[in-house]
Amino acid sequence: IFVPGILICQFYMFIRGKGHRRKQRKRAVGVVTGILSVSLFMSGCGAAVEPEKRMYPMALGVDASEEGICLTYGMPDLSESTGQGKEEEDGGSRVLQISGADFTRIEKMYDQSQEKLLDMGHLQVLVMGRTLVEDGRWRMVLDYLKQEIFVGEDLYVFEAEDAGEILNWHGEDNSSAGEYITGLIRNRMSGGNITAVTLRELFYEKYKEDKILRLPIVKIRNGSLEVEV
């Protein structure tokens, strides 16, 4: 508010100096009051939500379900995603699953049942269930993510028999599926051993050919996550 306040004062002095009639002064006071009110309102609207009041999914799984679709949100270690040095109290599951008829319904159910703001800006991995890929509902998934302005298009996309199962996996060091897959892909890419598929590439292929690219397969084998290309 400090900088806008200075500008408002300067603006007021300018208007005051331009005329000496009472009507002009009243008009200037009205304009300044309006600007100050808007500044105060905008500063309130722009207040940031504290990190501990946000949920930061690093991975998102999308499966077919009896209701329609099932979203699985996979969170990393809170201390890493927020820098607060706070760990999950139970040291266990950091996964949330919600099923609904469509994405709009699922978002509404999330808002009604969760106290934390959903922050999709940290999403790095998307896992789509095989049923959605085969029956064409992958288009619905891409359309949903396209309108999510905070979702980055450089996230990695995979296919799995059961996306929810993948996101419920935890490593021996309690690492989440999102953390493990991201690290694995980046290590392989740095060595030139893998070519990942990104959300940006899927968007391009969808709007160019209305097709989906062949996705790397992620699966659990003997308790370990494996990625097949």
Predicted regions and their residues:
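Glycine-rich phosphate/adenylate-binding loop
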Residues: 20
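Membrane-proximal alpha-helical signals and transmembrane carboxylates
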Residues: 2, 6, 10-15, 23-229
